[in-house]
């Protein structure tokens, strides 16, 4: 079997994250991009807020509630990301960080691995 190119691996992670968002969180992004930066996988998702989320985000308390709820849901599913990274890259996931903008509906996900992915996919 031919090894994956960097673009193929990034695209595979993008598709897996879109599937995760739809299955676990109920809605997929309008746009998704994945980038390898040293030992990190940077994922940018746009258009994640529902009409209800946008209404909730009109107050500061609602914004905090939205961010915290989404963060907890996301971080409770870390095993999904461990498997995704292992299957796609053969690397081990070290940590997961995420935040969502309650104004734009953009989520940034940073996955740190045990391998320099830029060197792995030269």
Briefly describe each language-model feature range.
Residues 1-122:
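Interaction-mediating elements
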């Amino acid at each position: 079997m031919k090894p994956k190119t960097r673009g193929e691996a990034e695209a595979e992670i993008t598709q897996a994250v879109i599937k995760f968002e739809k299955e676990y969180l109920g809605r997929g992004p309008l746009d998704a991009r994945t980038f390898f930066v040293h030992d990190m996988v940077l994922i940018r998702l746009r258009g994640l807020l529902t009409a209800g989320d946008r209404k909730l985000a009109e107050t500061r308390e609602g914004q905090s509630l939205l961010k915290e709820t989404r963060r907890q849901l996301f971080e409770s599913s870390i095993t999904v990301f461990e498997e995704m990274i292992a299957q796609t890259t053969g690397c081990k996931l070290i940590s997961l960080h995420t935040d969502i903008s309650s104004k734009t509906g953009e989520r940034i996900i940073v996955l740190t691995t045990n391998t320099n992915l830029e060197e792995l996919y030269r």
